[in-house]
Amino acid sequence: MSTTTLTRREQRAKAQHFIDTLEGTAFPNSKRIYVTGSQHDIRVPMREIQLSPTLIGGSKDNQQFEENEAVPVYDTSGPYGDPEVAINVQQGLAKLRQPWIDARNDSEELDDRSSAYTRERLADDGLDDLRFTGLLTPKRAKAGKRITQLHYARQGIVTPEMEFIAIRENMGRERICSEVLRHQHPGMSFGARLPENITPEFVRDEVAAGRAIIPANINHPESEPMIIGRNFPVKVNANIGNSAVTSSIEEEVEKLVWSTRWGADTVMDLSTGRYIHETREWILRNSPVPIGTVPIYQALEKVNGIAEDLTWEAFRDTLLEQAEQGVDYFTIHAGVLLRYVPMTAKRLTGIVSRGGSIMAKWCLSHHKENFLFEHFREICEICAAYDVSLSLGDGLRPGSIQDANDEAQFSELHTLGELTKIAWEYDVQVMIEGPGHVPMHMIQRNMTEELESCHEAPFYTLGPLTTDIAPGYDHFTSGIGAAMIGWFGCAMLCYVTPKEHLGLPNKEDVKQGLITYKIAAHAADLAKGHPGAQIRDNAMSKARFEFRWEDQFNLALDPFTARAYHDETLPQESGKVAHFCSMCGPKFCSMKISQEVRDYAAAQAIEVGMADMSESFRAKGGEIYLKREEA
């Protein structure tokens, strides 16, 4: 862990340098490949890890090798992972989905921004230096039209987004021929449907049933289509965002790019400080992954941080502002009802959700029902006009092990189920947020309750943390719970960084949180038995047994750390081909001994076979040619 502390000026300058010098970069010995769909502009990016051949024999001067297949893996890095693409953060990413959106002819450009706040910001010349220059003209649905992916799915339409996703979710496993790599243990799926091959029609079916969502605002055409659902591999979200006391636009864009490089499937911008609007524009125009927000945070800024002064009108204006910028999903704490707030009084840690506490305070101060609940149908109308998905927030999630699975938590969950049905009336896509802090033996009930109460809408959880005793290591405590709930059926895991409960994460914290959660998600996929989930593990194990060190580094989730740890003790190039590692040394390496045992067993089998043949030869009189009936 680095102990170097940079000043705010140094941090900002470093981030600016990162942005100014940014270019498409591949991981070591990997290359970007594209799999094309039924039309030329459906080009699905993947990363292909190139492997070295296996030495199978021959002489010192004439060695014989067997090729190892390249391993394709899911890639969230967008254009940032392609060395052939010219990156310019000032201009933003190419608008991948724009032709598909235009071809549907069910949306139209707006003459002016719908949000009064947006109009005010655009009229402020003092913000010119901060503002993203290539602003899009926002679109919304034409009158009487529904433009959500859920609407299309229910109409039986397979969109280009759905075909893109089907190709992406198969992760190129159809390219793998090796039986060794394709071997997979049967999983325990807890009722999930996991087809051997994911088709566009399967994607459509899952979206139509509400079991999966495709977060894809029509005003975020730069995003690469992805899906969140129980019957697909588990996804991971990364949180970024500035605060009133730290971080800049440059640093948040840097964290966005960094997050996608390390595997974030979606990113939530949780900014609460100055220039929220401008920061979000820069993030959206440069994001290849869906962006989520918690609109109540910005609405609170608009009333100077006084929760009691919040109004539906201010919140509605914020929804319009963010929807027209391109936010793909909103976290809405509409399930924090007035009658549930007293249930938290006997908790050890009360209400720990920022959004939940804001709404609870508003309800109590006005002694009125949550205005998000009261105006939920209007929220749905706004979301339907731009295809913004709803992430129904768990404002009453437990903030400590002692408060897990209590009355307040599950009362809110049941209300979220009721709201899900209302959102579906408007063809709005929905996922459900979950806890929190839950000990291991109480985790599965959360998944069971969610499936039953929320009609199998995708579950999206923060961990959960399985113990409260490890500040500084909560990416570990939560990674355990994340792997478990992912196995039970959770569709997306919100990462937790080492700074959880302590401070805002920096770049290295973001990476640590993402690697931890990619491990948890992959472990869950293995346990569920997702077809193809074991390919990379098998490739790694084969490389490990054959002492192909470079391949081991390159197959790792974090090749750089794997290489660095190896090189701490065996830095010489000869260490990259050694048939041992520094832990056991050359005489006690279990892999080396196993290879020797295998070679010895093979030799013994040949020797035994020859002895058996000799015995048979002598028993038959030692004749070279036998009569037919004796043969």
Curated annotation (Swiss-Prot):
One of its GO terms (cellular component) is cytosol. Signal peptide: none annotated. Zn(2+) binds at H437, H501. This is Phosphomethylpyrimidine synthase. Its EC number is 4.1.99.17. GO terms for biological process: thiamine biosynthetic process; thiamine diphosphate biosynthetic process. InterPro entries: ThiC, ThiC-associated_dom, ThiC/Bza_core_dom, ThiC/BzaA/B. It comes from Salmonella gallinarum (strain 287/91 / NCTC 13346). It is an enzyme of class 4 (lyase). The keyword Lyase applies. Pathway: Cofactor biosynthesis; thiamine diphosphate biosynthesis. The keyword Nucleotide-binding does not apply. Homodimer. Belongs to the ThiC family. It holds the Pfam family ThiC_Rad_SAM. Its cofactor is [4Fe-4S] cluster.
